[in-house]
């Protein structure tokens, strides 16, 4: 904890500098700079407040010990002892909170995401489950006051999806949904099953941070752009003009199709935005040394083929295999009540990081 405390002293000094800068008229008049400083100040606020409370508690304990050692009034001594007993209960919890707040932040945690859900093993039932997962994430996003927009999809005749891609925007979306990467298994009796037998199917979920233009630069020569007539909803206009856009990143073979915007230019811009995220994600995933180190003590590997969760409908049960968590409220989970699972995953990851930090400091 001593090393952490030494870091915190510097952090408090920097936090106070940021507050002074935010009151500087020159900074106030520079909107971009003010927003950057304001965000950094907000990011540090909680850990600084916790540390100040920790120091206050430590000082109060020391003051009370002095009273206990030097005071002759028995009532004052007893009061000081009682106060210290209460404060000393707070200290370990404060230390843990500070350690967690000081853990290295995932630089992508504040980002919006692109999520792809694919029906995998199980045919029609897998595609139906992909649709169920889509609705589950849509309802969860609604509970978080996030916005969901459709990118593209391949619906199936039975009402599911062979593949569906959505964008979710809001506050710290990636920080909560990054743990959804992997294979999701469902056990249930399909509507087409006449014998009442339970079938097992899977759908895969891929979660990618939405990267801004500054994060990655793609050579225009590496992109092939095809335009074609849009299909589906949109009225007569959408079928009369070649407004749909398909972009192919030649070095990786990644393809993005976009047709939900009204103009070709809008579809181009959105397709490029999504293509950049997918290309960046592709190259990041190739860097195994970096990922292995990053995920050494993380939850699973984040591999999209790794089975992470089972949804058992007959028993109304959900099991997350990475942390051994089982909850018997599948109906509520599928209705978007994912907080219990996601909070447990975040806590597990933080605990593993703290253990690694303790090993390094040992």
Swiss-Prot record:
Superkingdom of this protein's organism: Bacteria
GO cellular component terms, A-Z: cytoplasm
InterPro entries documented for this protein: PCRF, Pep_chain_release_fac_I, Pep_chain_release_fac_I_sf, Prokaryotic/Mito_RF, RF-1
Modified residues (N5-methylglutamine): 236
Keywords from the named record: Cytoplasm, Methylation, Protein biosynthesis
Processing after translation: Methylated by PrmC. Methylation increases the termination efficiency of RF1.
Chief location: cytoplasm
Gene3D superfamilies for this protein: 3.30.160.20, 3.30.70.1660, 6.10.140.1950
Keyword ATP-binding: no
PROSITE patterns with a match to the protein in the record: RF_PROK_I
GO MF terms, alphabetically ordered: translation release factor activity, codon specific
Keyword Protein biosynthesis: yes
Localization annotation: Cytoplasm
Pfam families, alphabetized: PCRF, RF-1
Listed HAMAP family: Rel_fac_1
Protein role: Peptide chain release factor 1 directs the termination of translation in response to the peptide chain termination codons UAG and UAA.
NCBIfam families linked to this entry: prfA (TIGR00019), PRK00591.1 (NF001859)
Stored PANTHER family: LD18447P
Protein family membership: Belongs to the prokaryotic/mitochondrial release factor family.
Name of the molecule in the record: Peptide chain release factor 1
Organism encoding this protein: Lactobacillus helveticus (strain DPC 4571)
């Amino acid at each position: 904890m001593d090393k952490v405390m030494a870091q915190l002293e510097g952090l408090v000094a920097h936090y106070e500098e940021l507050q002074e800068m935010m009151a500087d008229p020159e900074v106030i008049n520079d909107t971009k700079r003010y927003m950057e400083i304001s965000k950094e100040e907000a990011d540090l606020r909680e850990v600084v407040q916790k540390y100040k409370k920790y120091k206050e508690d430590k000082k109060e304990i020391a003051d009370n010990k002095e009273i206990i050692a030097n005071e002759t009034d028995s009532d004052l001594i007893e009061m000081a002892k009682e106060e210290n007993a209460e404060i000393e209960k707070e200290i370990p919890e404060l230390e843990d909170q500070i350690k967690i707040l000081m853990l290295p932040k995932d630089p992508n945690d504040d980002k919006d995401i692109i999520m792809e859900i694919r029906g995998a093993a199980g045919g029609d039932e897998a595609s139906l489950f992909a649709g169920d997962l889509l609705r589950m994430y849509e309802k969860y996003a609604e509970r978080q006051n996030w916005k969901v927009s459709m990118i593209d999809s391949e619906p199936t005749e039975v009402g599911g999806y062979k593949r569906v891609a959505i964008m979710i925007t809001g506050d710290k979306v990636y920080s909560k949904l990054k743990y959804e990467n992997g294979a999701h298994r469902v056990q249930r009796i399909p509507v087409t099953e006449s014998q009442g037998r339970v079938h097992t199917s899977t759908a895969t979920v891929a979660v990618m941070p939405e990267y801004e233009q500054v994060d990655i630069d793609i050579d225009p020569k590496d992109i092939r752009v095809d335009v074609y007539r849009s299909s589906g909803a949109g009225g007569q206009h959408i079928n009369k003009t070649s407004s749909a856009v398909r972009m192919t990143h030649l070095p990786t073979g990644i393809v993005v199709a976009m047709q939900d915007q009204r103009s070709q230019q809008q579809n181009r811009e959105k397709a490029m935005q999504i293509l950049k995220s997918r290309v960046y994600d592709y190259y990041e995933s190739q860097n195994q040394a970096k990922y292995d180190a990053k995920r050494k003590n993380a939850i699973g590997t984040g591999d999209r083929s790794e089975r992470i969760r089972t949804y058992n409908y007959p028993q109304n049960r959900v099991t997350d295999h990475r942390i051994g968590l089982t909850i018997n409220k599948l109906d509520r989970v599928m209705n978007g009540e994912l907080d219990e699972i996601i909070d447990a995953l975040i806590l597990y990851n933080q605990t593993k990081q703290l253990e690694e930090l303790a090993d390094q400091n040992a």
